[in-house]
Regions:
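Short glycine/proline- and aromatic-enriched beta-strand/turn motifs that initiate or cap beta-hairpins
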Residues: 23-96, 267
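Extracellular loop and loop/strand-boundary signature of outer-membrane beta-barrel proteins
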Residues: 29-31, 85-90, 144-150, 192-198, ...
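Outer-membrane beta-barrel channels and translocator barrels
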Residues: 37, 107-111, 168-172, 215-219, ...
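Residues that define the transmembrane beta-barrel architecture of outer-membrane proteins
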Residues: 38-42, 94-98, 153-157, 173, ...
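Residues on the lipid-exposed face of transmembrane beta-strands in outer-membrane beta-barrel proteins
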Residues: 44-48, 98-106, 118-120, 155-165, ...
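Flexible, surface-exposed loop regions and adjacent strand-edge segments
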Residues: 59-66, 130-140, 193-199, 238-246
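Outer-membrane beta-barrel transmembrane domain signature
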Residues: 151-154, 165-222, 228-238
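Predominantly the C-terminal beta-signal and adjacent terminal strand-loop region
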Residues: 214-267
Length: 267
C-alpha cells in the first residue's frame, strides 16, 4: 500500500469517527426504541469512494492470448516494444468518487438483518505504466501513442446484498459488521476505455464492512466503512481484433477492481 492510499484511509477513518461522535455524543433519552423490531424498513444513503486495480502483468507480453490468436500483430509489436518482452504497470494515485443509493432492510432475527442496497457509484482509477516504446511509431496508426499515466472513469450500477450482524445497543449507539456480495455493471468503461484497454462491463465483488448505528429522535443515522474486493478479471483478451488494443494495453494479464467506500445511511 503506497503512502497516498494510507493517508486516504486514515482520513476516511477519521471522518467516520467524527461522524459517529457528532451524532452519538449526547444522550438524554433512548430514541427509536422499537426501530429494530420493524420487519421491513427503507432508507437512502450517500457516500464517498475510492477505486483502484489489483494489477497483474504478463511476465512475457507475448504470452497474451491476443498474440497467440493473431500472430500477425507480433512484428509491429516487437518494433513498438523495442524488442523487449517484459513491462510493468502499477496503481498510481487515489481519486475520490461519489456513491448514492437506497436501502431495503429485512429483519431476520434480533441480531441479524438482510440488506439490499442498490445504487450508483461514480469514480476513477489511475495507474502508471513503465514501457520504453519506439517513439518513431508513436501516432503512426490508430491507438498507437505514448502514455505514462492512464485514468479510467467508471459509472457503476451497484446491486449489493448482504447480512448485517448487530451488536448490543448501548443507549443510542449500536455497532455492526456487514458481510455480503455485489454485482456491478460499469456504464462508462466501454465508451472511454475501448481505445485504451478492453474491459468487461460486469463483475462480482465480495464485501465486508463495519459501522455504528446512531438512533436520533426521528431517524437512524449510520456511518459505515466498506471494502469491496473484485472477484472478476476485467481484462478481455478475446476482444474484437477490429478494434485493437494499443500495444501498451497488451501487458495486462489481470485487472481486478477494489472499491473502498465511506457510507452515510438515513433510515
Amino acid at each position: 500500500m503506497n503512502l497516498v492510499k494510507l493517508k486516504y484511509y486514515i482520513i476516511t477513518i477519521a471522518l467516520f469517527a467524527g461522524s459517529v461522535q457528532a451524532f452519538g455524543q449526547r444522550r438524554s433519552v433512548d430514541n427509536l426504541t422499537y426501530f429494530d423490531e420493524r420487519p421491513l424498513h427503507f432508507g437512502f444513503y450517500l457516500g464517498l469512494n475510492t477505486m483502484d486495480y489489483r494489477i497483474t502483468n504478463f511476465n512475457n507480453v507475448y504470452d497474451n492470448p491476443v498474440f497467440t490468436a493473431h500472430p500477425e500483430l507480433i512484428p509491429n509489436a516487437k518494433k513498438y516494444y523495442n524488442n523487449k518482452t517484459s513491462f510493468a504497470a502499477e496503481d498510481y494515485t487515489i481519486l475520490p468518487g461519489f456513491t448514492v443509493g437506497g436501502v431495503v432492510n429485512f429483519r431476520l432475527t434480533r441480531d441479524f438483518d438482510l440488506r439490499f442496497t442498490p445504487g450508483m457509484s461514480l469514480g476513477s482509477r489511475s495507474f502508471k505504466y513503465f514501457i520504453d516504446i519506439n517513439k518513431e511509431l508513436v501516432n503512426q496508426s490508430s491507438g498507437m501513442d505514448e502514455k505514462t499515466y492512464l485514468t479510467t472513469p467508471s459509472a457503476y450500477v451497484d446491486i449489493p446484498v448482504g447480512i448485517r450482524y448487530k451488536g448490543f445497543r448501548h443507549y443510542n449507539l449500536r455497532p455492526f459488521v456487514y458481510l455480503g456480495a455485489a454485482y456491478r455493471m460499469d456504464l462508462e468503461n466501454k465508451r472511454i476505455t475501448e481505445s485504451v484497454v478492453h474491459l468487461k462491463k460486469n463483475g462480482g465483488y465480495a464485501e465486508v464492512g463495519l459501522g455504528l448505528d446512531s438512533y436520533l429522535e426521528y431517524f437512524r443515522f449510520t456511518a459505515e466503512v466498506r471494502f469491496s474486493y473484485g472477484l472478476s478479471n476485467l481484462i478481455r483478451h478475446d476482444a474484437d481484433i477490429a478494434k485493437p488494443t494499443p500495444y501498451y494495453g497488451y501487458i495486462f494479464k489481470e485487472l481486478n477492481s477494489n472499491i473502498f467506500t465511506l457510507i452515510f445511511y438515513f433510515e
